[in-house]
Amino acid sequence: MKVNKFFKKTTHVLLVAGLTIGLTAPFTGTTAQAAADTVPIQILGINDFHGALETASKDASGSPIGGADYLATNLDNATNSFLQANPGATTDNAIRVQAGDMVGASPAVSGLLQDEPTMKVLQKMNFEVGTLGNHEFDEGLPEYKRILDGVSTNKFGPIVEAYPRVKSDMKIVAANVVNKGTNTVAEGFLPYYVKEIDGVKVGFIGIVTTEIPNLVLANHIKDYDFLDEAETIVKYSAELRGQGVNAIVVLSHVPALSTGNPNTGTKQDVAGEAANMMTKANELDPNNSVDLVLAGHNHQYTNGLVGKTRIVQSYNNGKAFSDVTGELDKTTGDFVSPPDAKITYNTRSVTPNADITAVTEDAKSRIEGVINETIGLANKDVISRDTNPDNKAIDDKESELGNMITDAQRYMANKAGADVDFAMTNNGGIRSDLTTRLANGQNEITWGAAQAVQPFGNILQVVEMTGADILEALNQQYLSNQTYFLQISGLKYTFTDTDDLDHAYKVASVTTEDGTPLKTDQKYKVVINDFLFGGGDGFSAFKKANLVTAIDPDTETFINYIKDQKAAGKVITAQKEGRKVYKSQAEIDKETKDAAIKAIKEATKINKLAEKDKTLTGTTLPGATVSVQKATANARMALAAGPNATADANGKFSVDVTSLNLKKGDQITTTITDPNGYSTTFQATVQAAATTPPDNGNGGTDNGNGNGNNGGTDGNGGTNNGNGSGTNGGTTTTEDPTTTTSNTSTTGTSSNTSLPTTGDTAGLATVFGVILTTTALYVLRKRS
């Protein structure tokens, strides 16, 4: 779902405020003194029940809430209070409605039986009309229609086939879900439903969020179009008014949130898509006559007005219900004024409805053998899906349970021979913490607890993706204020800030789990569920992937992984591991620079320089630029031997240093700059050139006889070394590649101590001295 920025930023604070004050807006209601020309009406609504037959929670004071049997009692009590306040009213004046997601993402007690126990409970509680939520599409609308119709099936095994199902009398309205290319509402559902109360007609229009294509398996929505919410409301409200129906209620699976203080008794603001929907509808048709909207999908408290339209929502999982009351004018056929409402907790301080309890207990008995089976062990009582247990300023969106689930998917895919690199799953598919039971001093994981974590049964697909597409998918987490995000296995990444208000963070770097950088042009195998493969939750990058193969559904995969660990004698020890790490841009810049300099230092070997050498050679990073200059104030840049003095594909380089006229003792600075612009310097001291030894023998062309001292003469007047091994003259150096260290960056350089050189170091001064002395003696002899 998309939610406006103010809504997203205020969700947590306002929800807490709503809980703290008990969820109650002033209940003005109708009374026994209502005028005879008006009709009292009560609308009791729930949303996002998700098969929560016995799910317990707590209110702001810590008191227990939740459970279908308690909800039945509390709804009956609310109706009785309404009837007592309006003696002329009957139960026909009290209507029970729902705003979608009654089924799907359900605990085992309902989910294992295809949510048929939930449909039975709603039938017993007399819910008269409702709409679709995204989870009604989880297994396709035909399957939801089968559940409504109470039709048997042999598709899901014996415990489902044997369940004593019932046909639902509840009308389903879904005006903006139509068969593709038509205006016909899908699966024979209705665009609206009209109920007449004491001569006044009330219309109920059904609306589903147009985000459904991003929330549901592509195969389950391919046959439908989802029409604009506001335009559909305007269309059918006009049609209803044409039939004399002026009191109009919209049952919408569209998110909303109150932004005011419900305790003030004054008009409250409402934010979110439901508010935007009604604002647009009012602009399109100011006379649309919509008096009430029941919202859903984002599981929040809502109770406020948009114009003259009341918008309500009552959390999720049966924690609370909306109690809306008003008066209908018999003359106009409309509400006298915007209806009043209060959001009431489903408290457990009442006596639970025995009939509903019996349905739940029957369902539990049918699945007991399955859900109570111990399938594994854990090292703690709860493995949490919480991504920010320490309340850090920046939530990294990594959870210990998310790590366990994706590790399980990667493990099981590889066990099946798929040879995958990574696994990713949408966090919305993780429906509860993994709880354990203490038995024999151990934390046992049951089948039911595991199923509650991954209840959807989405097919796991092994797909091939490029590194670039993986990077795109990771970045898509940071759109829409991280409403949708991923849990990952096999890779790690760092994210940092951006200046984009709609994209607060970006992925700075990605590596595999062993630290190898992700290559954007390389293809990887990734395990994802078919929901993500269809671009679910807005992750369009996954739609670019190519299907390789499929493995078991996510529920079975998770359960079988836990069983495998138990069979191997392993206790599960899931934890957060820093797979997603936030760093500031300054931290990233420093780390990037340090890593680049380290890489240059490790790759660089420079051969030694001696006096009058013509080239400097060595190896460094391929593509790096190499420059050489004398380390003096008047240094001149050396001429490069190759274009731009760039190291070749093997990292080899050669720089022409003839122009530097190197002399012994010169300080030479070599600067290496990598292809990304990071550089460091290396310093060396030019050493003396190797001495050119004189030849031995006749005319200085042979080695002579052997063993005279340096500078002596042989019998033929030739000079020799006296060692019998003279060589032709010339400068020599010994290649002894040496690297140095540096702390330079793209904007500055620093260097280390001089680079040592080796080689022959015969003193030329001695040779010249001998020559001069000999010449002087010869001149003196001639003069004498």
From Swiss-Prot:
GO terms for biological process: nucleotide catabolic process. This is Cell wall protein Lmo0130. SUPFAM superfamilies: 5'-nucleotidase (syn. UDP-sugar hydrolase), C-terminal domain, Metallo-dependent phosphatases. It is a peptidoglycan-anchor. It holds the Pfam family 5_nucleotid_C. Residues 759-784 form a propeptide. Its main location: secreted. Residues 1-34 form the signal peptide. Transmembrane segments: none annotated. It comes from Listeria monocytogenes serovar 1/2a (strain ATCC BAA-679 / EGD-e). It comes from the Bacteria. Residues 730-759 have a biased composition (Low complexity). Gene3D superfamilies: 3.60.21.10, 5'-Nucleotidase, C-terminal domain (3.90.780.10). Residues 697-729 have a biased composition (Gly residues). The modification Pentaglycyl murein peptidoglycan amidated threonine is found at residue 758. A motif (LPXTG sorting signal) lies at residues 755-759. GO terms for molecular function: 5'-nucleotidase activity; metal ion binding; nucleotide binding; UDP-sugar diphosphatase activity. Induction: Present in both exponential and stationary phase (at protein level).
